[in-house]
A protein has these predicted regions:
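Short periplasmic/luminal acceptor-recognition loop of GT-C membrane glycosyltransferases, typified by
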Residues: 199, 406, 410, 414-454, ...
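Membrane-interface transmembrane helices that cradle and orient dolichyl/undecaprenyl
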Residues: 119-125, 161-177, 187
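Transmembrane-lumen/periplasm boundary regions of multi-pass, lipid-linked membrane glycan transferases
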Residues: 44-51, 55, 198-310, 323-333, ...
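Signature aromatic-anchored transmembrane alpha helix within multi-pass, membrane-resident enzymes
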Residues: 15-16, 182, 203, 224-229, ...
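Transmembrane-helix motifs of polytopic, lipid-linked glycan transferases
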Residues: 98-122, 159-164, 302
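Hydrophobic/aromatic-rich transmembrane helices and adjacent perimembrane loops
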Residues: 151, 190, 196, 322, ...
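Short acidic/glycine- and proline-prone juxtamembrane loop motifs at membrane-interface regions
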Residues: 143-154
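Membrane-proximal, lumen/periplasm-facing interface regions of secretory-pathway glyco-
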Residues: 35-36, 337, 368-419, 433-441
Length: 503
């Protein structure tokens, strides 16, 4: 078995990924609507795709169902995945599996290119795929791979960009330089932080190697020109987003940093103790895998001089970049695990660096039986990782603590259409503290409790064109804010979702 694995690592890699997908119930999850952790942000993503489909708008005119501002028009990350998903709806119908599937394809692409990168530093073997399996089975990385958010696609495209720039470094091929630049541009457009770390760290290493006369001025100049182009693309999109949101008076998407110095000491300690080392820790990986990462970090430090010169320096810049990011976005770590996804990049490269050292410096010196034993240990760790991922995915998708709104909202749209409520009719939806969870579920534009604060007024929404009030919690039927508008009941679903005519 181990001999076959060493001879066919890429087959084994995607076999393990397929096993991970099946064991973690990916066959069902891929068709789930937004749910569980960060249903709010997931629904925003779905809302972008659905409105592209329904409005037929262009790539540069994104909007959501929430009518804050002008007709719901608002932008954030480059919406190419939502745009592609919205257009695929025209051919295959509106299915959540299309959007989740696009993200998962990006995840697979990233796995493939990371495998290709590692192949440039060590011969193809079981050791080569081990770091990738640990990344692929990280529960929170996998959770967002089979999801709607753009973080994992951004990281995946940056792995592709890195591979092509590494090939350029070895061959001076302009074709590979251009392809890598395109991948890095797309990665940073999706997420400037998650998609940009790998590119910036590589540029830093290349610059140092140039100072040591390991590269020509022409190569450095070409890389700098491409980096300026990537930076220009990011700046151009950021400038457009600010202009677009200002034009449409919609600033629901935050575009700034969340630095640690905005927090008081008590809150900082809470994030460290209760979130990073508490609530979130189980979703990073199984404890034994985290201990293994700690061991790799220790070896990375004490065996520094023996490590691959490029990998040790590149990994160092990844660590420094991630630490800088953590300081600048630390406030978000309290409630958002996806803000921490960037940290998987230095983590996996620490493992890659140490594994390459083992492969080139340690294994050739030990008996074959010990190598065999190491292979068994690696397969065992992979099995533990797959099992932990399955458990976390099951918990996230089944536990009531992750249910934020009435789950029946995703079954209501056919009822609305039977009642004569058109997809274009404006509604008021409550309760819903998010901009788009219920609106995206009902597939109707309108207003929620989000971004209204003291201006929340059903009568005002009715004057703006809202025709119906949909309440998905019986307790809200008795709230003074809604009682005057619950006179014309025109339909209900499962005795917990009520539809009222506001006209």
């Amino acid at each position: 078995m181990l001999k076959w694995a060493n001879k066919n690592p890429v087959i084994l890699l995607f076999l393990l990924v397929a096993i991970t997908f099946v064991v973690a119930d990916g066959i069902h999850i891929i068709n789930y609507p937004p749910r569980s952790i960060h249903q709010w942000r997931q629904s925003d993503c779905v809302s972008y795709a659905k409105t592209y489909y329904e409005k037929g708008s262009g790539l540069f005119s994104p909007s959501t169902y929430n009518l804050a501002g002008v007709d719901g028009k608002v932008a954030s990350e480059f919406p190419i995945i939502y745009y592609i998903g919205g257009n695929l709806f025209h051919f295959f119908g509106v299915h959540y599996g299309i959007l989740r599937g696009l993200n998962f394809l990006c995840y697979l692409l990233g796995i493939f290119y990371l495998y290709q990168c590692i192949g440039l530093w060590m011969k193809r073997s079981l050791l080569q795929i081990f770091p990738i399996i640990l990344l692929a089975t990280s529960p929170f990385y996998y959770y967002y791979a089979l999801n709607f958010l753009p973080n994992v696609p951004a990281i995946s495209f940056s792995f592709a960009g890195l591979y092509y720039w590494l090939i350029y470094e070895r061959t001076s091929s302009n074709k590979h330089l251009i392809i890598g630049t395109l991948f890095f541009s797309l990665a940073t457009l999706l997420k400037p932080t998650d998609g940009g770390l790998i590119w910036v760290a590589y540029l830093a290493v290349f610059s140092i190697k140039f100072l040591k006369h390991q590269f020509t001025k022409k190569q450095l100049l070409q890389l700098l020109i491409c980096s300026v182009m990537i930076s220009g693309v990011i700046y151009g999109w950021y400038t457009y987003v600010k202009w677009y949101n200002d034009q449409n008076n919609n600033h629901q998407n935050l575009l700034s940093i969340y630095p640690i110095w905005m927090m008081i000491q008590h809150d900082i300690e809470y994030v460290f103790n209760e979130r990073i080392f508490g609530f979130w820790s189980v979703v990073y990986h199984q404890k034994i895998i985290l201990y293994f990462l700690g061991l790799c970090l220790l070896l990375y430090v004490i065996r520094w001089k023996a490590l691959n010169p490029f990998l040790r320096l590149y990994t160092l810049f990844l660590i420094l970049g991630a630490l800088a990011y953590d300081v600048l976005w630390f406030t978000a770590f309290s409630d958002h695990d996806y803000y921490q996804l960037l940290n998987v990049i230095p983590a996996v490269f620490i493992i890659i660096t140490v594994v390459e050292w083992c492969s080139s410096k340690v294994l050739p010196k030990i008996p074959a039986k010990m190598s065999l034993g190491l292979g068994v240990v690696l397969i065992g760790l992979a099995a533990i990782a797959i099992r932990q991922n399955r458990n976390i995915q099951h918990d996230r998708y089944t536990q009531d603590m992750y249910t934020y709104v009435n789950p029946d909202i995703y079954e209501v749209e056919p009822v609305l259409r039977q009642l004569g409520i058109k997809q274009t009719d404006i509604i008021v939806s409550a309760p819903d503290p998010s901009p788009n969870i219920t609106l995206a579920a009902y597939n109707n534009p309108g207003y929620t409790e989000s971004f209204n604060d003291n201006n929340y007024n059903v009568s005002l929404f009715a004057k703006k064109g809202a025709k119906y009030l949909i309440i998905n919690d019986t307790a809200y039927l008795h709230k003074p804010l809604y009682v005057p508008y619950t006179k014309k009941l025109i339909g209900k679903y499962k005795d917990n979702i009520f539809i009222f005519d506001l006209r």
